[in-house]
Amino acid sequence: MMRFIATWFYIGLLKPAPGTWGSLGALPFIYIFLIIELNVLYLLIISSIVFILGWLATLIETKEKSEHDPSEIVIDEVVGQWITFTPLFIITSNEKFHTSICRNVFNININSETYSMDIILIFLSSFILFCFFDIIKPWPISWADQISTPFGVMFDDILAGIFSALCLTIILFFGLLS
């Protein structure tokens, strides 16, 4: 069961670039969360639960192994990618932001038969931002990446998600996708 969680439904076993596959594996869940109009608070609660499960799964999966962050463990990418989408959920969960930013910057109508190009651009931008920060690892992400524990495996991707979320906030606020 822990391998199933650590590899995010075995997506982490895909080659090449299992981390990228893990990040992609997070996106259908974000899409579902948008369809069911999940509140940002619930997104953060679910992300926290998956973080704790991922931490435990990583602890068990790396026990008695020489490598502290095997490439097939991608649960950290999933949580980091979900954190990247936090600004979008803040906007869609908050009526004040929803009317001012959603109407003027992008048109999200996830329940319609035709999806706006803007939601595709938001997904693409979020994915690229997270992958960028996860690969480049500027400080303090690089510092967290050096923590050779299961917490460190998870934490560097949390920071990459936070950096990506900040960039996505700027992009959405200034309408840079329009």
Each predicted region: which residue ranges?
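Interhelical loop and helix-boundary elements at the membrane-water interface
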Residues: M1-L24, L56-F85, I108-S116, C131-F163
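Short alpha-helical transmembrane interface motifs in multi-pass membrane proteins
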Residues: Y10-I11, V40-L43, I122-S126
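Short Lys/Arg-rich amphipathic alpha-helical segments
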Residues: L14-F33, L41-V50, A57
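Interfacial segments of multi-pass membrane proteins
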Residues: L24-E37, F85-L88, L168
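Membrane-helix exit/interface motif
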Residues: I36, L53-K65, T86-I101, V105
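Interfacial loop-to-helix junctions that mark the boundaries of transmembrane helices
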Residues: E37-L43, N111-D118
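Juxtamembrane boundary at the C-terminal end of a transmembrane helix
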Residues: T169-S178
